[in-house]
Amino acid sequence: MSRFFRGGNESSSESSSDEEELYSEEEEEELEDEGDDSDNDGSGDDDSDSDSDADAGGKKKGAAKFLVDDDSSDEEDSDAEVTTKVKSAKDKRLDELESTVTAIANGMKINDWGSIATEFDKLNRQAEKLRTGTTAPKMYIKSIADLEDFMNETLAKQKVTPKKMNATNARGLNAVKQRIKKNNKEYQAQIDAYKADEFEFMMDTEDEEEPAPKPKKAAKVSFDEATAEDEEDDEGFARVGKGGKTLQFTPESIFKHLRSILESRGKKNTDRGEQIKIMEKLGEIAQTPYQRIRVLLALVSSRFDIGTSAGAALSVEHWKAAEKELSLLLTVLDENKDHIVLESAEEWDDDEKPPTLEKGEKYIKIPGSIVSYTERLDDELTRSLQAIDPHTSEYIDRLSDEGALYNIIFRAQLYYEGLRKDASLEIPQESLNRAIMRRLDHVYFKPAQVIKILEENSWKAVGDKASNITPREQTVEAAQLVNVLCNYLFANSEGIHRARAMLCQIYFLALHDDYYKSRDMMLMSHLQETISSFDVLTQILYNRTLVQVGLCAFRKGLVYDAQNTLQDICGSGRQKELLAQGVMIQRFNQVSPEQERLERQRQLPFHMHINLELLECVYLTCSMLLEIPLLAQTGSSPDIKKRIISKTYRRMLEYHERQIFTGPPENTRDHVMQASKALAAGEWKKATSFIHSIKIWELMPNADAIKTMLAKQIQEEGLRTYLFTYAPFYDTLSIETLSNMFELESTKISAVVSKMISHEELAAALDQVKQTVIFRKGVELSRLQSLALTLSDKASSLIESNERTLEQRTQGTSNAFERQGGRGGRGGGRGRGGGRGGPRFGGNTQRQAGGTQFTGGALGAAVRA
């Protein structure tokens, strides 16, 4: 709609608001610059029917819409009769300003700082359009003066009352606190006049009634001149900002630029790359330690903001830059002991005057958190490693940055150690615990040689500094370092940090083959009872520790302990998910995108993975050594309850036995299944050959010792399987014969047989004089007897199920089984159902339902005989 279009009589307020929405910012500025002539003409003219004219005006096309003034002479007479009220742009802005002031006042009544912060920004934008030189509208001055007083009252109450604000109110209050003091400095003279006499200030309207002679154009001229001067100045450097404004960087303007950058943080359409370049320039010209610290803190935060915006990992360039800046920040803090960075420090609001040490003060406190930046740097490296293909050289190059990160973590620990020496600072223990926990997270899963290299490089980086928690002389060995870090967290932390420290130490001990100590710590911690109440990352660490303890037991030759420990993880079939080494494909459960995203974020980097193929191989091998003798034992003794050690292994074995043709083994699972089949048949040498041919054993330390241990285990379990299978066919069996068959020493054979006899697994006696095993007859059933009893049990179960089915169909009717003549006397003298209820012929006794009188017939009698 053209700005020359005239508003109607009856809808002055509606048309004015509609016009305001349709006007662009450029049109409004041009309208003010060109003067009020067109507004006066539009307000002076009038139509007899506003609705019809508005419609007609809206339909005019081309040059016709500019012919409104052609018949103005005919309407001069009607102007005297009908008065039209059309609001100017200035009046409309004043109305908007008044509504915003009212909204702020309402927010102050209910203490809603979130809405106050929003309306305060809106108020400043509106007041900027209404400024005449350095003078602002009086209602604006009143609003910001009252708001500053109210803010000071609220801050005073917060220091006295222990009740805290909610997060939204706290953020709003902090935002207003940061902006209002800087904003009110520009209007300090007017604010002082208002506070001196509020009534007189608001009643005096002479200043507002004086028209401003085209302030916009004057501002433009002055801006152009300033820009020209800046362009001519070649001594310093300048950056052109938005709208062609020239930004001057001087040591005095550092805090002003930082303030503007921090205020725009988190807003849309913010060029973070440009902000980082500005802060890098500010860092170059910073002179005082306070300026350098403030710039570095803001710069590191801005780099991390880039990582969160895209949802991906921080780029390598930005990560390395953040690492260097954080290292430089720690260096500056070390060189200037009177400057400290604390989370509890208050924000310094005066951008023109930096803080100085007052009498009785030892430190200049700067708000910030070194440990939070350190944790974020660690998390960004982890996210980067998650996104890189682990089988490329890029992953190795990226992993090399862990050394620099470990140095940062170590220096952060030393920094908080130094702060905690001064009790007056009241540094929370949690900050130091977080730094130590991060350090422990980077060493617990590594071999001792790698940890030693990391520690040596870290101590070289810090020079002559000393640590009270981890002294140099006590942390030379990796085991000592892990023990010192864990003991400190045991004594000075609670909850998650304490549990994670316990799990890290158990993992480290199991990784370095200290099985019995790691097992005892795991049992004494009782974490298995409370682990479900911890967070997901701690549960993942618990699963990893459990698996590592199981692998350690296997390396020690403790097959039963290893299988029992690995059962929970490997028996579930969800090893990838439980160990955070991959996302399982859900067939039936629909996983939301948010859950899948969180699951992927929790994945561990590849260098922390436990080899799942090796884990499966260990689990299946242990299950084979336990299940095959058990199957042989239960096969010859049906009275023994058939228990299952590993359902996963049993299913694999049954599937393998159902195959008609079995080819050569191709993978780990095939090797174990064919070894199981050979072991069950007594061919222990063949089983050993299959197990030794698995190539995954080479990934374990001391692979030859592992293979030797497995060969001995297979020999012993082969002996047990042979005795369980063929005991019913022997009266006596020489130990020397068994020794030759299984290539074991006679003493070992005697020990195995004695153990089986003592556990009542074998009905026999050991004649140590003649070195023979004497089997007792009548205790173990023969194969035929076992099959006969099995058939008897199945027949009895079939009869019982049939009679239960019949009872259900007849609905428990009495006399359901009392039928005469085989078919209930159908067609007899008593008609249909004759003889029902009478005695049976042939001398047969009545049989009760339920099959309780079944005796097994001839087969059962033969078995009983």
Swiss-Prot record:
Residue stretches of biased makeup (Polar residues): 808-817
Residue span of region Disordered: 1-92, 206-243, 801-865
Compositionally biased tracts (Basic and acidic residues): 82-92
GO biological process, one term: formation of cytoplasmic translation initiation complex
UniProt domain PCI: residue ranges: 606-780
Keyword Repeat recorded: no
GO MF, any single term: translation initiation factor binding
Listed Gly residues bias regions: 822-841
Any one Pfam family match given in the protein's UniProt record, by short name: eIF-3c_N
The UniProt record lists the keyword S-adenosyl-L-methionine: no
Keywords of this entry: Cytoplasm, Initiation factor, Protein biosynthesis
Subcellular location: Cytoplasm
Cellular component GO terms held in the UniProt record: eukaryotic 43S preinitiation complex; eukaryotic 48S preinitiation complex; eukaryotic translation initiation factor 3 complex, eIF3e; eukaryotic translation initiation factor 3 complex, eIF3m
Biased composition (Acidic residues): 16-54, 69-80, 226-235
UniProt record similarity statement: Belongs to the eIF-3 subunit C family.
Function, as annotated: Component of the eukaryotic translation initiation factor 3 (eIF-3) complex, which is involved in protein synthesis of a specialized repertoire of mRNAs and, together with other initiation factors, stimulates binding of mRNA and methionyl-tRNAi to the 40S ribosome. The eIF-3 complex specifically targets and initiates translation of a subset of mRNAs involved in cell proliferation.
HAMAP family referenced in this protein's UniProt entry, alphabetically: eIF3c
SUBUNIT field: Component of the eukaryotic translation initiation factor 3 (eIF-3) complex.
The protein's name in its UniProt record: Eukaryotic translation initiation factor 3 subunit C
Organism: Pyricularia oryzae (strain 70-15 / ATCC MYA-4617 / FGSC 8958)
Name of the gene encoding the protein in the UniProt record: NIP1
